Regions:
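Long, charged N-terminal accessory/stalk domains
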Residues: 125-126, 132-181, 185
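Walker B catalytic acidic pair
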Residues: 305-307
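Structural recognition of the conserved hydrophobic beta-strand(s) that form the central parallel beta-sheet
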Residues: 72, 328-335
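Hydrophobic "anchor" residues on beta-strands that sit immediately upstream
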Residues: 18, 97, 116, 301-302
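Conserved NTPase motor "head" modules and their coupling/switch loops across ABC/AAA+ ATPases, GTPases
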Residues: 1-31, 45, 174-301, 310-314, ...
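Nucleotide-state sensing region of NTPase/ATPase domains
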Residues: 47-133, 137, 142-149, 203-211, ...
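Conserved lysine of the Walker
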Residues: 36
Length: 361
């Protein structure tokens, strides 16, 4: 998997950018708030069909503009693919248009055209944050490698919203309980499909992450386990109906899943040091890259956003070793110091300032 070229127009702080990328290591240097993260985000959007950091898609549109455009040429499996992702805003309405080789595609069908693993400082929330961060991690990985996962997830969310709406109407005496039957059945069916995909992925991810973690930490044991919904979700939905009616929301299902992360048998979120948590995150992200490659047959593009400065020498060395082994890598940093000179000699190095990408020096 290789990103050949990237074009941005009115995207965040990039008024216009046309960029050719090298096949291996691409390094972008620059001070904070110059556009380094925005650049990596644009590639992640092509992999996920949505931003992993924007609260609203309208946030992607640059100042004094009505739309934002991301275009790319990608080489994958011996073929070249042209991708286009446009976000536009008219009045209060935001829309997006996605094209693959000029043909319109739905957002849920874009993931898989580009495989990428994004690693940035906020990923520490994978360990120390709430369950929603770990569910997002699983979803962002699975939409890239499990055909139809994105569609199933989108449908599950719509059915869940409908069920929660009905719960409120039933509690208010505006609907009968029998109106839930069809939605409960579909929620259980979709939820089972999501849970199965997540459980299989974690079973494959766990040994990869454990091996990486042991190598970086000097022998610590990283354990992953899936805290998913009950096997018979339909029965649980019926049994917990009274509680759901009181709360006006659905209490069981994969929207409540979690990924348990333990180090030497102890919960990493509650008891691990920050250094141990960072090691776990590095191990998880590298394992994600390995899993995407094993499932898709394509080595994903590795996106590293100013993370080297956040790591101590041992973890930095482990990550840089993987950078040397990886396919295409796009990495940002405030300065070149964290990179070995031998690695920099092989890299395409450019500087970013105020939304402009130029040669350094």
């Amino acid at each position: 998997m290789r990103l050949v070229s990237l074009t941005l127009r009115n995207y965040r702080n990039y008024a216009r950018l046309q960029l050719e990328l090298g096949p291996r290591l691409n390094v972008f240097l620059g001070r904070n708030a110059q556009g380094k993260t925005n650049l990596l985000e644009s590639v992640a959007i092509l992999a996920l069909s949505s931003s992993p950091r924007a609260r609203r898609e309208s946030d992607l549109i640059g100042p004094v503009a009505a739309d934002a455009l991301i275009e790319a040429v990608v080489e994958s499996g011996g073929r070249r693919v042209e991708l286009s992702f446009r976000v536009s805003q008219e009045s209060e309405r935001t829309g997006k248009t996605i094209r693959v080789d000029g043909v319109a595609r739905r957002a849920v069908d874009l993931p898989g055209e580009v495989q990428a693993t994004l690693f940035w400082p906020d990923d520490l929330s994978l360990v120390k944050g709430g369950p929603e961060y770990r569910r997002r991690f699983l979803n962002e990985m699975l939409v890239q490698v499990v055909k139809g996962y994105g569609r199933t997830l989108a449908r599950y969310r719509r059915v869940l919203d409908q069920r929660n709406h009905l719960l409120k109407r039933i509690a208010a005496g505006q609907e009968g309980r029998d109106s839930l039957a069809v939605w409960d059945a579909e929620l259980a069916n979709l939820g089972g499909a999501l849970a199965s995909a997540r459980a299989l992925a974690i079973a494959d991810l766990a040994p990869l992450a454990a091996a990486g973690h042991a190598a970086i930490s000097g022998g610590e044991v990283l354990g992953l386990s899936y805290l998913g919904p009950p096997a018979d979700l339909a029965t649980v939905l019926a049994a917990t109906l009274e509680e759901d009616l009181r709360r006006g929301t659905t209490g069981a299902g994969p929207h409540r899943d979690d990924l348990s992360i333990a180090i030497d048998g102890v919960d990493a979120r509650s008891f691990a040091s920050q250094g141990q948590q960072r090691t776990a995150v590095v191990s998880l992200k590298l394992a994600e890259s390995d899993l995407i490659e094993s499932r898709s047959g394509e080595r994903p593009i590795l996106l590293l956003d100013d993370v080297l400065s956040e790591l101590d020498p041992r973890r930095r060395e482990a990550l840089l070793a993987r950078v040397g082994e990886a396919g295409q890598v796009i990495v940002t940093s405030v300065e070149a110091d964290p990179f070995p000179a031998a690695l920099m000699e092989l890299a395409a190095v450019r500087c970013i300032s105020g939304g402009r990408v130029e040669s350094c020096g």
